[in-house]
Amino acid sequence: MESTFSSPAEAALQREAGVPGQFTPPEDLDRVYELERVTRFICDLGCQRVALQFPDQLLGDAGAVAARLEEVTGSKMFILGDTAYGSCCVDVLGAEQAGAQALVHFGPACLSPPASLLPITFVLGRRPVALELCAKAFEAQNPDPTALVVLLSEPACAHALEPLATLLRPKYQDLLISSPALPLPVGSLSSQPESLERFGRRFPLNPGRSLEEYGAFYVGASQASSDPNLDPDLSRLLLGWTPGRPFFSCCPDTGQTQDQGAKAGRLRARRLYLVERARDARVVGLLVGTLGVAQHLEALAHLRKLTEAAGKRSYVLALGKPTPAKLANFPEMDVFVLLACPLGALTLQPSGGFFRPILTPCELEAACNPAWPPPGLAPHLTHYAELLPGSPFHVPLPPPESELWDTPDVSLISGELRPPPPWKSSDDTKCSALTPRPQLELAESSPAASFLSSRSWQGLEPRLGQTPVKEAVQGRRGIAIAYEDEGSS
């Protein structure tokens, strides 16, 4: 049945969901998915049940990969797809529900520390890279052989950084090569104990050097992309990189480069705008965007403490993957804060399709903590773990008697003066003897009550005792699209 207000019932069966899947030729499965290394990982652990996690675009190969691994290892494989949150995070909950003893993650990964001690290995992929073209592009953008530059890449191009560095090292002696911060095998020691770990990567810095001194050359961004928004991995790097240092991206297929300085400036400007929106907000929705990343419960408690200290009301919402339709059910919220891994938190920005802006935890920290940022710290963090106690970037809330809470604050959006937190008493104890007793006109100020009073429809009227009592009668039968008492059209 089809009408002006509904689609035909057959449309739900004919609709193609998700993105087109990838089908790799059988002879290339071993190379693309590194099955030899995965087999060695499973056999060394002696696992009998293994979970294989695939993103949507790789589910077409999931069956063939699982069958090949079962044949070689003799272990039982479980395919994990359609994760409740971002596919870049390991689905440790799904693996534990399947009784898996280990997990293999295929595809792009944020490499955030998991909340479980389950053995995990990552297969990031091996995207082809034109080394000669990328080397020429690097030399064109860095004519000074003494320049401090670090080589970065998207996860699928990480395998090409060492060969690229081999071509460049005869000329560039101070070249720094990053590597994915993959978990080390159980019982092994890192060969680079002094390496700095940041942005999901390891940087083997020389003594006396800091990452803030280096420019960046990123292999992986493509100028042929039709999406005007930056991918989350590159956005994460641009936000956290030192302002003023050169940052170039290079397409691994063509070797074409692009200066990302202007895009980094737009990202930081958008972050400042979101901070202002968070400062103006009275009701904040905390969206749970991960259950598999370490310290997510501590981060949730930290965000609730922040909003309470700033005099804001917060609500925790566990909705799975956020969509405009889901969040539209909560019009009381002024802003939403997505508690997720760095890539998941940046995936929804810019949040043009949502009726309220979606922030990252770092933006809420900058809005609610008057002591943020401390001198010498750039406020462009991307991971919520960097805000928690124990992190070198943690900034505790100032005490209630601190003058930071009394600093005049004017909204850059509305131009109005923001009031201090409600718990901050404005009464002067020296003049309390002359203060008249209040008449209790306002018992309590509630953002929810203010929002309800401003709505044109406030719900059904109870009208207790005013409605006549009637006997129950049989109602309509059927579904909303076609009740039984309606004729077919």
UniProtKB/Swiss-Prot annotation:
Organism: Rattus norvegicus (Rat)
Residues recorded as bearing Phosphothreonine in the entry: 435, 467
A GO biological-process term: protein histidyl modification to diphthamide
Cofactor: [4Fe-4S] cluster
One Gene Ontology term, aspect cellular component: protein-containing complex
Family listed: Belongs to the DPH1/DPH2 family. DPH2 subfamily.
Its job: Required for the first step of diphthamide biosynthesis, a post-translational modification of histidine which occurs in elongation factor 2. DPH1 and DPH2 transfer a 3-amino-3-carboxypropyl (ACP) group from S-adenosyl-L-methionine (SAM) to a histidine residue, the reaction is assisted by a reduction system comprising DPH3 and a NADH-dependent reductase. Facilitates the reduction of the catalytic iron-sulfur cluster found in the DPH1 subunit.
Record-given protein name: 2-(3-amino-3-carboxypropyl)histidine synthase subunit 2
Top-level lineage group: Eukaryota
Modified residues (Phosphoserine): 7, 446, 456, 488
Coiled-coil portions: none
GO molecular function per UniProt: 2-(3-amino-3-carboxypropyl)histidine synthase activity; 4 iron, 4 sulfur cluster binding; metal ion binding
Record-listed N-acetylmethionine modification sites: 1
Pfam families, alphabetized: Diphthamide_syn (PF01866)
Subunit structure: Component of the 2-(3-amino-3-carboxypropyl)histidine synthase complex composed of DPH1, DPH2, DPH3 and a NADH-dependent reductase. Interacts with DPH1.
TM helices/strands, residue ranges: none
Co-factor remark: Binds 1 [4Fe-4S] cluster per subunit. The cluster facilitates the reduction of the catalytic iron-sulfur cluster in the DPH1 subunit.
Residues that hold [4Fe-4S] cluster according to the record: 89, 110, 341
Associated pathway: Protein modification; peptidyl-diphthamide biosynthesis
